[in-house]
Structure formats: structure tokens, C-alpha cells
Amino acid sequence: MPEQNPLPFPDGQSAPPSPAGAETGATAAALPPAAPVALDAPAPAAPVLAPARVAKRPWWARLLGRLADPWLSLTIEPEQPGRYDDGKPVVYVLEDYGLSNALILDKACREAGLPSPLVPLPGDPLERKRAYLALSRRSSSNSLIPEQRGGKTHSDSLAKLLQAHRVRADLDVHLVPVSIFVGRAPDKQSGWFAVLFSENWALVGRFRRLLSVLLNGRTTIVRFAPPISLRQTMAEGLPPERTLRKLQRVLRTHFRRIREAVIGPDLSTRRLLVDQVLAADSVREAIATQAKRDNSKPVDAWRKAHAYAWEIAADYSSPVVRSASFLLTHVWNRIYAGVLVHHLDKLKQAAPGHEVVYVPSHRSHMDYLLLSYLLYERGIVPPHIVAGINLNLPVVGTLLRKGGAFFIRRSIRGNALYSAVLSEYVAQLVAGGYSIEYFVEGGRSRTGRLLQPKGGMIAMTLRAYLRQPRKPVLFQPVYIGYEKLMEGNSYLDELTGRPKEKESIWGLLWSIPKVLKQNYGQVVVNFGEPIALNDVLAKHAPEWNGEPLPDDEKPTWLAPAVDTLATQIQTRINCAADVNPINLLALALLSTPKHAMGEADLIAQIELCKKLLAEMPYSDRVTVTPHTPARIITHAEEINVLTRVSHPLGDVLSVSGDTAVLLSYFRNNVLHLFTASSWVACCFQNNRRMSRAGLLRLGRTVYPFLQAELFLPWSEDRFAERIEQTIDMFVREGLLLNVTDDDGGILARNTGQTDEVFRLRAIGHSLQQAFERYYIAISVLVKNGPGVLGAGELESLCQQAAQRLSLLYAPAAPEFFDKTLFRSFIQKLRELRLVWPDENSKLMFDERLDAWAKDAKFILGRELRHTIERVSPEAAKPDVVSPPAE
């Protein structure tokens, strides 16, 4: 198991220290903050301790020590503790009491040549016949997974030691804090039980501690801290009670920081977070309002708020996360041919000092598990994950909750109390420095495209930061790419009109054996370029001075900032795409009428796609499979995606039926990477010749709509440059010819059915249906006239026209009649003022829309345009009631 950091800090770089209290002085200085670095980094300077005491250890300690020795193997930090030669007595300080801790400490001292903690100091100032004390007592509970840490207790021994210093002026005991971690990160070979009983934040009972020592004692870490002089501490002149409280606080802060550095922050705080949420002013006001609205008692509204908070809150458990990691390793090895991670090192460079919000693409339920697993395996504490309430199933929901998931309802509109509780819970997570993960798309994509983002969680995160701007927030886009989806068949059913099946525990259990028998290929997780929230705020709110904003203040720049963040997240996810073998096969095979190609043609088409990606890189974070076209074909056959039909004139490779529909999902994953090349190729589908200037003009015209649909990163000028680069490459490849230099150059494609024409047509096919959708919307608008249709009516009529066109003309991909794509196109028309609403919310337009429609002849064939115009419906006319005859 790799070393785990509480946040993704680079090795050797410290997190910003948290304050230890208002007082300062020799005591605070004696315990420097523990930097969250990997455990193999240099440890703090060794305490130099007194020679071993002459008195023998108690007989029971010698007996139990011999019994425990075979089960213990210690890693002592620092490696070579020295000796303290001025004769000052030493008392060790542990975080909590326990026989196992005493025996481990005694063994560590013997191995390091230090004084035994089980032999009392001269005069026994502790009055306990020993030389160690602890700040807390273990809970007597022997539950295997306790939900809460036991309560802290007042250290009587420390009070007695301080009192002894007041009585004896010659006494100067040095306190040496010692942190003990049993099984901090056991090897996977140790077994599931070893992972379950490894070190965590809970104070556990004797039985659990015994199992922990037996299973994980051979991976025990003992860390000594520099000593504290009690005489110097008392020299500060504070009152006795205040000295005791300060010393205990500093020691607890030290132990907490060491524990955070070794096992990550304490995330098992469900009850604490719920209490903090319910105590917040905004929630208390919402409770009072709810009671008035329901005409009920305040306590009833409070109970409702408590139920909401308890339904939402995560219940992070380190043992469960470790156990899940152990189990998932075997699952991934069984169903996937590897999980690759790219650019995580860049996140580790950018993350120090930031609150990290992970915003991945969402294409499978596996996304939840994969990202958390990969972060944990690479030494980063998994984030708190926003999950839909539909996943809060019996047993499964509990496990997800203990893995860091918190559950939210799909719709919170009209429920002010729930909204207040959820907003406050997110605010508490952000203020507490916990990393968060959510899917801005809201749900899983059924088409393979990134969905239009929803800004609800982004707005909550932004408001939480503005309320308490402690640590700057970093949004981390993540692209997760699959070669085969577990949910493929259910997506297929939904896309053909069948209602989405409700998740159930029995459905999950029934699917497990089938899933484990499948080969789902390789998974790639790419980390995109992070987005600093402060950079977005600097653009949208330059007047904000960094001071906290009250909850009731709603600045006008908040909504535009949320929209910008949402679009940037989707754009940067696309900029970190991975192109896998199935993506390339889908691009090639779905461009043919029967979704089949000869093997030589398929190899040539894949080579062309890879060359386009190599010569015109989309971004420096896009990754492309290194496999050759021949190996790609073999791999697709291995995972049962591709069918080979032998033939004397050459083998034919094809996909058919449901597989072809599912392949459109993987084509859509990478459609944005080929936008410029597909645009140029589309223009030559129905045109033998075109001018370079005409290509650029039309490209600038259509680009805003492509940008909104595919989350493209370029300006219009930059897109025009990519069109120029694409043209030059097509000329070099022989796909286009420079005929004359008129009008910036006249370009022509080859005549006949040459290989070059075939490859050009295949490249252009992927964007063809997008332009058909655009023309459907324009045709429906023009046919009905200005001031007739509202935006919602236009969406419905466009969807009906697209469905009919698919039935009459040619089968289309499922997203062809997706209403949300029409909605996005209509919204972009409104933004560009090509259409606008009148006083009755009906869409108006002028002759510019007619000109836009005329340009369609350069892209769509005459027959297709005519068919679209014929199937474009008109809005139903209201019945005209004839006036009664006189």
C-alpha cells in the first residue's frame, strides 16, 4: 500500500499548519507542527534521553512482553534515538491508555536503548509506579466498528506531575510524546481482516485492539517527538489550571497532527457534523419558518431537519475504506484489463494549500468507486462524494456512506428546509477542509456525450467558500474512459424508450455474477487542468475583497460565476479525454451504412484518425492508445465488440444490432476531438469543390453551436486556425487537392469512389447528424413563422421531426432526437440574437435566419434537405369557432 497523505501534497511539502491555540510560549514551540509528508521522509530530530534506569521492569511486563514479542515488529522514528546525558528524568506521553500501548512503548524503548516506561522515576512523582502517562482512556466498548471516538478525559497523572514540580524546585521532568500506529497500512497480502483492524481515529475496546495487534502488530510505527521541559513550561507563570489545560491542548494538537500525517484526517464525524448543521443560524431560521408554515411545534420541525441531515450525512470509516480497497483490487483485476492513471502528479503539484473539489465525468456507477479507489491507492484521502438518494439501498447505502458518500435528493425545489440543511452540510465540509466529489452533469450520460452541467452543487460550494474563505478552492476535472460499460444494456433499453428501472438490492445482487464473468477491457482516468476558484472570482467579482459574505447576501455576479465554472469544468474534462481502441473503431465503423469494413480499409481509417490526433493535438492532457491498428482490432475481438467474417477477397469486420447502437456511445466520447476535421470533411460530402475562404466563413458561423454542444475550448479565430491546419493536412494526405489560388484557394476532393473519398466521407460522418439537427430546428421555425412557437413548443416539434426523419430516411443514433440537444441549440440561437422572445414568449426572427438556412446546402444534400422540410411539423392551429348565424 502506498503511503497516504491527508491531502495530495508532494513529498516533503507541508500543509498549512492549523492553529494550536491563542497562547504561545516555550510549550508550543517545543512541539513543531507535524508536516503531512510520506513516512519515509526524514523524521524530526531524535530525543536524547537519560540512561536506562537500574530498577527492573515488573514481572508481568516481562512475561507479557515475551508473549507479545513474536507478534510485534516495530518501525521506530527517528531511526537512531540518542541518549540524554544530563540526568534529567523522562516521562513518555501516549495519546491514550492501553496495555498493548504500554507493551509496544516498552519494546520500542528497549530496542532503542531508552529508559523503560514501566520503571518509575525516583520519588515516583506520578504515583503510578511507571514513567508514562496518557491523555485519554480507551472506551470499554468492544464493538468492531464503533461509530464515535470515546470522550477525552482529564489527565490526573499530568496534573500530579505538574504539582510535583511546584513542590520540588529541583525537579525537571521532560515529557516525550510518543505516537503508536498498529497496522497503519498493512500489505494486501495480510488479508481482509488485517485491513479491517488497522489503525484509525476511533478509540476502540480491548478486544478490537487485541485483534489489531495479532493481525497487524508486525507493521507497527512508533514515532518519538522532541522532549518538553516541564520546568520551562511552568516558568511562563500561568495559573496552575491554565498551565494544565494549555499543556494538554498542545499535546493533543501534536498527536492529532501526527495522526493526520500518518493516516489522514478524521473523517468519521457524522454526528458532530449533523449537530453543527442543526446549530447553524440559517438552519435554525429554516426550522422556525417550517414550524410556522406547518403550524406545528418547533421540535417537530427540528426532528424533520435532523432526519434530513442524518439522511444526507456521510459516515466515513477508515477500516471500511481499507477493506473496500482490499476487495476492489481483486474486482478490478477480474473485470478490467488494467486501470491507467495520467496527470495525477500535476494535481499533487497544484493542490497544496487548497480545498480540492473533484468533478469527474459521469458515465457509470463505477465512477464512484474507481476515483476513490485510485486516490486512496496513491496515498490521497478519498473525497466525500455526492450520490443520488436512489443509491441509498440497504447494505449498499451503508457501505457507500462509510466510504465517504453523502446522499442528496434528485429534486429539492419547494423544500426550503431540506435545501437549508444540504447547503449547510456542504458549507461545513468546505469549512472543515474535506475534499469533495460531485458530478456536475447530475446523472450518468446515456449517450456518451458530456451532458449540460447543473450548477446546484457548484453554487453551494461557491457560497460555502464565500461565507468562510479559509482555504482557496481548486476544482479538479477528471475524465474517466471505458472500453465497455456494465450498464450498456440498460442504457440501450432507456434510449429505445423503456423507463429507467429503479435500483434495488436484489437487482444488484442478481447482476454481480454476470458482471464478474465479463471482460470490460481497460479503464483510463485522466486528471485535467485544475480550475482555481479565485481566478473565476477575480474575473466576475473584481470588487470582492476576500472578506466573508453573509448567507443572506446574494451578489449579482454569483450566477454568472457559477455558469462560467460549470462550462469550464466540462470543457476541461473534454481537454483530458482518452482515445481508446473502441473509440477509434466506433468512429470508423459507424461511418458506413452497414457498420462494416474490410480489414485493410479499417486499418487505414484508424491510422488516419491517430494521425489527425498526433499532428493537431487537442490539448497536452489528451491521451491516445499506443496500440497499432492491427492490435486494436485484435483487442476488440477479444472483448467481443467486433465480429470477423471470413471472405476469399478479404475478411470483413463489423458490428451489428445492439452493439452498433452502443458503439455510438464510445464515438460520442471523443467526437469533440475531431470537430475541425469532421467539419471540413462534411463540407465535401455534397460538394465537389469549395473555396478555402468559404470553408472558413461557414466554420465561423457554425462554431458557436458546436462549441455549446461539445464544450470546445477555442475562440472562433482559433477554430479557424484549426480548420486551416486540417485543410493543409488533408492536402498532404491526398484527401483534398489545391485546384486554383482564387478566393484564397479552391479545394476539391477526388472524383469517383477512390480510397481517399471513402476516408474523407468516414471522417465527416460523425458530425453529419449534428448539422441535420440544426437544420431541423431552423426548418421548423421558418415553416411556422415568427411569433408562433415558444421555446418549449419548438423543442417538442423538433424532437418529433427528428424521430420521423430517422424512421423515413435512415436509422440515427439515439441522441439524434434528444430534446436537450435541441434545447441547447435554441438557447444558443437566443444568445446570438438570431431569435428572441416577444411579449407572449413566442420566438421572433428575421431574414438572418433564412440566410443561415440557405448555407445548409453546402453541408446537407438536396434530398435530405427536402425530406427535413417535408417532415417539419407545424404547430396545431386553434379551432376557430364560427359566429352564430343571425
Swiss-Prot record:
A motif (HXXXXD motif) lies at residues 362-367. One of its GO terms (molecular function) is glycerol-3-phosphate O-acyltransferase activity. It is found in: Cell inner membrane. The keyword Cell membrane applies. Residues 20-29 have a biased composition (Low complexity). Keywords: Acyltransferase, Cell inner membrane, Cell membrane, Lipid biosynthesis, Lipid metabolism, Membrane, Phospholipid biosynthesis, Phospholipid metabolism, Transferase. It is an enzyme of class 2 (transferase). One of its GO terms (biological process) is fatty acid metabolic process. The keyword Cell membrane applies. Its EC number is 2.3.1.15. Residues 1-29 are annotated as: Disordered. It catalyses: sn-glycerol 3-phosphate + an acyl-CoA = a 1-acyl-sn-glycero-3-phosphate + CoA. Its main location: membrane. GO terms for cellular component: plasma membrane. Pathway: Phospholipid metabolism; CDP-diacylglycerol biosynthesis; CDP-diacylglycerol from sn-glycerol 3-phosphate: step 1/3. It is a peripheral membrane protein. The HXXXXD motif is essential for acyltransferase activity and may constitute the binding site for the phosphate moiety of the glycerol-3-phosphate. Belongs to the GPAT/DAPAT family. This is Glycerol-3-phosphate acyltransferase. It comes from Xanthomonas campestris pv. campestris (strain ATCC 33913 / DSM 3586 / NCPPB 528 / LMG 568 / P 25). The lineage of its organism: Bacteria, Pseudomonadati, Pseudomonadota, Gammaproteobacteria, Lysobacterales. The gene is plsB.
